[in-house]
Amino acid sequence: MIADTGKRYTLVPEETVPSKAKSVKSLTSLAKRSAQLAAGFVCAIALAAGVPTVAGAQVLTTDNVCGKTADARGITADNLPDIDATNALVMGKDGTVYYGRGADEQVKIASITKVMTAILTVENCKMDEKVTVSNDAATVGNSTAGLLEGDELTVEQALRGLMIPSGNDAAVVLAEYVGKKIDPKTKDAEATFVKAMNERAKKLGCTGTLFENPHGLDFDEWAGDMHSTAHDVALMMQEAMKNNTIREVVASEDSWIEVTGADGTDHSHSMDTHNYLLGQDGNIGGKTGTTDDAGYCFTSAYNRDGDEIYTVVLNSTTTDQRFTDTATLANWYYGHKVTVAIANTQEKTANGNPLMARIGQTDWTDKTIDATLADPTAQATVFSLAGEVTEKVSYDDLSGTVHVGDKVGSVTLKQDGTKIAVMDLVADEEGAGPNPIEWLLVKLDRLGRRIDNRPLTAESETVAKAPEV
């Protein structure tokens, strides 16, 4: 259990950890729950103190930050996340990868596989459709939603059984049902579903993923070559969180599902989330996964003040550590997001607004217009480790009369080649065009300027500088 000191936490059963030797039952005894609670406090204290909870946690300057190694960017160890997972990633809602460790290495992802199962389910089904539990689904074993052969439930209830308690039975139920919908003539609905999983992964841009079943078990009869990458997992989580139904399901701390048994009687199942970070510091959902080969895995979504990211940790050493790693990655990312004023200038216009530029009026040889931002208080949010911010100011052709508020140019801010802000420049003073007599004088002035090889209009000048990070 992970909980920040002083925050409310929910005591939930440990995720079943499948073993090649035999299945391990969920922790249900008070003693085991108490041990889990104690572990959560230890982990929370460690997070507060800024130290890893296991000796394996480490900082690697070979990790990637915004597409380059930390070494290449000159980022020191104290500005990098201290995590245990061998493979990890932080990705923004727009697909920007802020951090990666072994992010393209093909590894096992265990029950994180169910994120893709959920995606295909919501894309192919209405939530009130009814599904029936087959013998194959009821007997898959390991982590389950407690479904029995012949049980009938809605797709939504099965989806909850899939994502909240990580039910392998629910995964097979949905795979069989959706596979049959995809190809009504199929003789192997689950195989049809798995094929669709791989096709959908490719459409998402996943380049290192192979699914072989809908639940992620990778041993005994399920042993094979199934694999994915931290980057691919982030793409799946990003896609899943676009769906409101999935967002609501993974945000549920606990849930009940209603099932009609084979004998016609109704009964309910209580389920607790395996996401021990849910609701803490912006965590809005996630999916765990654990097998001997995959280690302890977790992908999650965070949203703080509208800034949404997706984190992935694969092959952490313990249940607690995967959550510590996840919290560390989220805090690292948000801790390096800074807000800067777009108008980085000490000079003011006559109206008291930030002076961004003096832009030449093309009908005059010696007049300029003071330009400010369309929103003088505008700010941009940048990631401080992504490099310096650069500024480009463009000037419009200012002919004729210019009025206060007229667009006179624009400013573009980029960081590491990525556009982070664009804003119009507007006139902050009136600028009349020349009358006929003045226009004649301008022409005479320009004649002399041509002879002397001088500029024919007042030169525009950028006053503001790029914001400092």
What residue spans do the PLM features occupy?
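N-terminal targeting leaders characterized by basic, low-complexity, disordered sequences
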Residues: 1-25
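Active-site-adjacent loops and short helices of periplasmic peptidoglycan-processing enzymes
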Residues: 6, 12, 55-231, 235-244
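Domain-terminus/edge residues, biased toward the C-terminal soluble/receptor-binding domains
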Residues: 224-469
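Alpha-helical transmembrane segments and their juxtamembrane interfaces
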Residues: 42-46, 124
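C-terminal segment of classical bacterial N-terminal signal peptides
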Residues: 45-54
